[in-house]
């Protein structure tokens, strides 16, 4: 079975209650795009997930 790396881009923001929250802003399969997003500011980051290549297929 093939696996795919999925990168969830996130950023920190201040919520309505004044607390700092992490917000998902995009999803990409490109590691370089994820690293570029992270390098744009200290508030940016990404999480990496490995998912089966056939995750959408019926079982």
Language-model features and meaning:
Residues 1-24, 50:
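Short aromatic-glycine-(Arg/Gly/Cys) micro-motifs in beta-strand/loop hairpins
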Residues 28-31:
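Conserved aromatic
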Residues 34-38:
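Short amphipathic alpha-helices within nucleic acid-binding modules
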Residues 39-59:
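Short, mixed-charge low-complexity intrinsically disordered segments
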């Amino acid at each position: 079975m093939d696996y795919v790396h999925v990168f969830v881009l996130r950023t920190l923001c201040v919520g309505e209650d004044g607390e700092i929250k992490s917000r998902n802003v995009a999803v990409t399969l490109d590691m370089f795009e994820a690293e570029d997003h992270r390098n744009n500011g200290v508030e940016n980051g990404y999480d990496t997930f490995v998912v089966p290549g056939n995750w959408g297929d019926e079982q």
